Amino acid sequence: MKKISILALYLLLILFSGCMRSVQLNERAIVQAVGLDWKDSEYALTMQIFDPEAAQGDDTSGGKMLRVTGKTISQAMRNANLKQGQEIFWGHTKLIIIGEQIAKDGIESVMAYFNADAQSRPNIDVLIADGEAGEVLSEPLDSTILPVLSTKMMLEGYQDNGKLVRSQLRGILGSLENPAVGAYLPMAAFS
């Protein structure tokens, strides 16, 4: 009986072990928002990365912008890891902005990439940029809070007032899988 209990305990301990390596918070680049564009036959990613030191001070940007390119989204992400020197973390991403050119060519591959990533959450808001997503994401906002949070609050306000219907990753994926339903996304433009 004692041997069975010890064996059961060992099996239980094996179940609690994870298959992913441990990454400390200071080794991660926490992406708050990402803009994807298609330029010169490659993807151009603009990422707003959270910077805790900037968030503690008077800097209302709360982060830094990282711009990378690649033939595929995966290659651009690998380039972002190399350029940033930290592991890119999607778990707290609140906003994806897709450039107008990618939207015209089809968003299926972009949505499939974020759906396949284990860190991406299904409730990420998705917008189409009127022009380039990197420009929309880089636009400074007159705000005392983080720009991505300000944009998210604007989306919620417009939805509450019936001015737009928010599109999130899970809803878009469902619409793309169903041939009887069309996906709809709000367009972001600054004037």
What kind of region is each of these model predictions?
Residues K2-S191:
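Membrane-proximal alpha-helical signals and transmembrane carboxylates
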